[in-house]
């Protein structure tokens, strides 16, 4: 009886080790998805708790004062707002189209997400087009009754599945108005800071955006380093030199390298810890089994 109990415990340890090992590998591979690198910096003002009141002109003046104007090829801003009415967005037709798709785990995740997205963020198309231009992508075109669906990469488990739903051009409701979703889902990062995330948003014409948000929004100002500077020094050196000058200005910032370093630390920590535990469990189980054979 004692040996059978020990064998059962060892089996559980080995099973747990295999589960942990699989989880560790999944964490490492699942978080290594390709993110299109466009922005090098996102700026904030040191005196402010958030950057809602920071505008592009203020950033340009501070960069000029710090002698950094020539080091940036482009400074752009993106407004992000919410409908002035609470729970004003309905994805009912999107959910219906999604239910018609082949069943999968990702389908259930997306269904839950769209059901919860009744207060989705809104983004003006002109400013998102500036981001697309920086990424060497063609601009988006919209009429007053059309919108593009935006989903952050971290919240987009299956881009092909979402695009297959959008092919039907489903209509959504925003503050009681019918809006047709067109094109493919958009997912370019609007800031370098991964702590600022958007799950689901709508890209709207500028006039529609201002009307639905009642001109109340957050403003995110970002910068792109000059290509010649990056080519000459390399990205890490260019950002390091720029950081030294930025540290002497009133602007606080998040750089692409800082963000990547933080994300890499999280991924390595999570994956290594689970794999390490898996190895410990395997060693303990094998030791117990070995001792039993020696007795």
Regions found by a protein language model. Name each.
Residues 2-30, 261-295:
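Hydrophobic alpha-helical transmembrane segments of multi-pass inner-membrane transport and secretion
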Residues 28, 34-280:
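Basic-flanked hydrophobic alpha-helices used for secretion and membrane insertion
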């Amino acid at each position: 009886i004692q040996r059978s109990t020990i064998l059962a415990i060892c089996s559980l340890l080995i099973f747990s080790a295999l589960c942990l090992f699989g989880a560790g590998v999944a964490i490492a591979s699942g978080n290594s998805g390709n993110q299109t690198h466009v922005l090098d910096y996102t700026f904030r003002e040191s005196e402010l708790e958030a950057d809602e009141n920071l505008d592009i002109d203020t950033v340009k003046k501070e960069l000029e004062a710090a002698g950094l104007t020539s080091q940036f090829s482009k400074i752009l801003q993106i407004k992000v707002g919410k409908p002035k009415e609470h729970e004003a967005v309905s994805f009912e037709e999107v959910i219906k189209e999604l239910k018609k798709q082949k069943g999968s785990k990702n389908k259930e995740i997306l269904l839950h997400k769209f059901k919860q997205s009744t207060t989705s963020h809104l983004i003006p198309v002109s400013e998102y087009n500036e981001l697309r231009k920086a990424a060497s992508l063609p601009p988006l075109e919209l009429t007053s009754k059309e919108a593009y669906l935006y989903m952050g990469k971290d919240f987009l488990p299956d881009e092909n599945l979402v695009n297959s739903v959008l092919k039907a051009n489903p209509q959504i409701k925003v503050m009681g108005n019918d809006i047709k979703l067109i094109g493919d889902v958009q997912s370019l990062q609007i800031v370098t800071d991964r702590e600022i995330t958007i799950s689901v948003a709508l890209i709207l014409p500028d006039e529609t955006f201002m009307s639905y948000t009642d001109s109340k929004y957050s403003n995110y100002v970002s910068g792109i380093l000059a290509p010649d500077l990056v080519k000459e020094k390399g990205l890490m050196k260019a950002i390091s030199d720029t950081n030294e000058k930025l540290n002497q200005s009133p602007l606080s910032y998040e750089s692409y390298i800082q963000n990547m370093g933080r994300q890499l630390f999280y991924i390595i920590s999570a994956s290594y810890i689970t794999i390490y535990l898996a190895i410990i469990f395997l060693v303990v189980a094998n030791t117990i089994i070995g001792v039993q054979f020696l007795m």
